[in-house]
């Protein structure tokens, strides 16, 4: 994602380049912000009988956001507070910005918002991590998962209706191939990985071209085995999986070396003790003022920040800890 921060004007100009970038824009935009950009809306000039769709530059004060990860869409709604000259009657009316890859918007933040942490968040979006379509297969089922820097999304599980009938097994593999073709067209992954028992992975290579990842299990269980394996360590680091694994280990072996929950993390941050923090995206959206001030404090003391999606395995663990947890320096 391309971005430019103007500290004097308190603005962040962003150009999302991938659907994943929309997630980071969603994290940054809060109620009360002013969002500017080019858009298209219905406009009826004075004296005209009918309105028409007109491209115009305007700004809205944000009242609500709607982010759909499955559709890869972000909508920002609010009343129009600025509009280009020559367009009468639009100011004060409500408008919806559809934020899409390739279209620039400018976000004006409130005076109390800590701009210093914004760049750290946007750097996460700039990390060019591979998008992986994982096919985890055994002789009973094939599980499809989409793995990006944002987390692991389980898409579908296809069951083998021909269990025990060797003559029909190739029909099962053919149905898996068709599903792979459909998902590849829709998701456009950078890599396709086939995981499962070694003999089956070799056999299905006749139907599907992709990286082979032989392992003990396939299907749904194989998805979790793949995530925990040493493959794609860089991806796991970006997702916060390795940080979470260290957090869990430290919590079990040296409880005083971790901070769990908002109160403990706030106390540690005030002393500059946070080495790294894992925070849920939902925690930020539920208490934005409090969360951003805390993250800024951690950032200023050289702490690393991992924002974790709630709908991931790591996210479920952090949710159980109160939405935020950290490993401490001393």
Curated annotation (Swiss-Prot):
GO terms for cellular component: cytoplasm. SMART domains: eRF1_1. Its cofactor is a divalent metal cation. One of its GO terms (molecular function) is metal ion binding. Its main location: cytoplasm. SUPFAM superfamilies: Dom34/Pelota N-terminal domain-like, L30e-like, Translational machinery components. It comes from the Archaea. Its EC number is 3.1.-.-. This is Protein pelota homolog.
């Amino acid at each position: 994602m391309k971005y430019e921060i103007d500290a004097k004007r308190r603005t962040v100009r962003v150009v999302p380049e991938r659907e994943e970038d929309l997630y980071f824009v969603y994290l940054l935009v809060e109620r009360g912000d002013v969002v500017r950009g080019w858009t298209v809306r219905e406009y009826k000039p004075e004296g005209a009988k009918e309105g028409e769709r007109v491209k115009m530059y305007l700004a809205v004060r944000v009242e609500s956001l709607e982010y759909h990860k499955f559709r890869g869409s972000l909508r920002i709604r609010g009343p129009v507070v600025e509009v280009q000259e020559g367009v009468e009657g639009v100011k004060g009316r409500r408008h919806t910005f559809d934020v899409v890859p390739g279209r620039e918007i400018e976000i004006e933040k409130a005076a109390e918002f800590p701009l210093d942490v914004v760049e750290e968040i946007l750097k996460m979006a700039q990390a060019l991590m591979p998008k992986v379509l994982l096919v985890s297969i055994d002789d009973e089922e094939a599980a499809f998962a989409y793995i990006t820097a944002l987390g692991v999304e389980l898409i579908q599980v296809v069951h083998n209706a021909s269990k025990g009938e060797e003559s029909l097994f190739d029909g099962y593999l053919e149905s898996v191939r068709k599903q792979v073709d459909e998902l590849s067209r829709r998701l456009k992954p950078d890599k396709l990985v086939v995981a499962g028992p070694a003999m089956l992975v070799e056999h299905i290579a006749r139907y599907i071209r992709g990286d082979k990842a032989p392992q003990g299990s396939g299907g749904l269980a194989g998805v979790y085995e793949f995530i925990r394996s040493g493959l794609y360590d860089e991806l796991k680091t970006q997702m916060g999986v390795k940080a979470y694994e260290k957090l869990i280990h430290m919590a079990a072996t040296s409880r005083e070396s971790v901070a769990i929950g908002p109160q403990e993390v706030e106390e540690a941050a005030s002393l500059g003790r946070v080495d790294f923090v894992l925070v849920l995206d939902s925690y930020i959206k539920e208490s934005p003022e409090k969360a951003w001030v805390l993250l800024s404090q951690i950032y200023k003391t050289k702490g690393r920040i991992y924002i974790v999606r709630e709908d991931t395995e790591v996210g479920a663990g952090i949710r159980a800890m109160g939405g935020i947890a950290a490993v401490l320096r001393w």
